[in-house]
Amino acid sequence: MSSSLSQTSKYQATSVVNGLLSNLLPGVPKIRANNGKTSVNNGSTAQLIDRNLKKRVQLQNRDVHKIKKKCKLVKKKQVKKHKLDKEQLEQLAKHQVLKKHQQEGTLTDHERKYLNKLIKRNSQNLRSWDLEEEVRDELEDIQQSILKDTVSTANTDRSKRRRFKRKQFKEDIKESDFVKDHRYPGLTPGLAPVGLSDEEDSSEED
């Protein structure tokens, strides 16, 4: 009777341990009770649990570090954006005041100096932008000109070659049509005049 109770208690304890392992450390091998014996001894099981617990703690710490770092970056961006928005609003309000004082003719010396400085800086920026735009436009014009000249030169060369070939062809035809025999004008070489036999031709040559 006591042996049966002891066996039942062991099964219950094993089930409780396995339940805890599956909740806390998923994937950890379960302990199996077999005739009062476990497939894994207590020492190795304790080491396995300890190792997995340490690994889980490391993962949790790493996740916490990542979360903190991400939150810090988000907060930093928010602070930077808030500061930029605040500066822009302050600058806008200041410019509106300067504009009003300028229209009313009530600019102070300090405001006048600041306004002149602002105008000068904006003028320099505009000149810089204009210069960059001008250089960019000029480069584009040069590229287009080079491309146009290249295409035009290629077309001109092809046109010249075609004209030369046509001219040469016409001259060749003309020469072939008007080749004269030096003894009988109007006849092509190798043909004797009408009425002149081969014998007469031979006697004449003698």
Curated annotation (Swiss-Prot):
Subcellular compartments: Nucleus, Nucleolus
Compositional bias ranges of the Acidic residues kind: 197-206
Chain intervals for the UniProt region annotation (Disordered): 178-206
Organism domain of life: Eukaryota
GO cellular component entries: nucleolus
Coiled coil: none
Primary localization: nucleus
Pfam families on file: RRT14
Entry similarity comment: Belongs to the RRT14 family.
Function recorded in the entry: Involved in ribosome biogenesis, probably through modulation of rDNA transcription.
Protein name per the record: Regulator of rDNA transcription 14
